[in-house]
Amino acid sequence: IRYMLPIYPMFTIFAGWFLSEIIIKFIPKRYLKNYLITKCLILLLVFFISIYPMSFLSIYLHPNTRIQASDWINKNIPHGSRLAVEHWDDSLPVYGMQNYTQLTLPLYDPDTKEKWMNIESTLRVTDYIIIASGRLYLPLQKLTDCKNLPANRCYPLTASYYRNLFSGKLGFIKIKEFKAEPTIPLMNFGINDISADENFTVFDHPKIIIFKKE
C-alpha cells in the first residue's frame, strides 16, 4: 500500500470523474437542475465515501495494541517469567522487558529436525507464548503443499504447531487477546481486516495473542 501512495490523488480524481459520469447518465437533467435534489445527492455521496475513513480513524481512538499488551503484561504476568516470542517480529512488552526472560521461537526457519528440537526444548521452559502479530502464523499455515514449494519454504510441521497452539493441544491456553479493527461509527460494527496488507495487520495495529502454559 505504501508504494502506491504517489498515485492515490489520481485515483481520487478518476473516482470523482466516474461518479460524475454515472450521475449525468442515469439521473435526468431536470432533477439535477433542482438545487435540493443535487444537494441531497452530494451529501449522500459524501456520507458513503466517508464511512470507511471514519471507521479506520476509530482505530486511533485507543492506545496502540502493542502498548495495551505491554501494560497488561507488566501488570498481570509475574516478573521473572519466561516469555517466548517469535523471531522476525516485535518483542513484547515494549517496556519493562528487563523484568522477564525472553526466549525466541525460530518458526520461520525451514522445517528441519534441528529446528523442532530447538523449539521443543524452548517450549519446555516457557511460561508464556506471545504472538505479536500475524506476520508468521497467517502465511506459514498456508505453505504446506510441499510438492509445489521449495523444500526450505514448506511448513507442514509449523502449520501443525499453530493448529495445536490455537486449539489448546500444545499445553498452552489463550488468556488474552488485543486487537483493533475499523469500526463503523454509530453502529459499533467492526470490519475484520486481518487479511489486509501487512502495513495494517503487522505494523499499524497488530492483533496480539498471549498464551499461558497450563
PLM region spans:
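Hydrophobic/aromatic-rich transmembrane helices and adjacent perimembrane loops
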Residues: I1-I23
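Membrane-interface junctions at the ends of membrane-embedded or membrane-associated helices
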Residues: A15-L44, E214
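Catalytic lumenal/periplasmic loop and adjoining terminal transmembrane helix
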Residues: C40-I209, K213
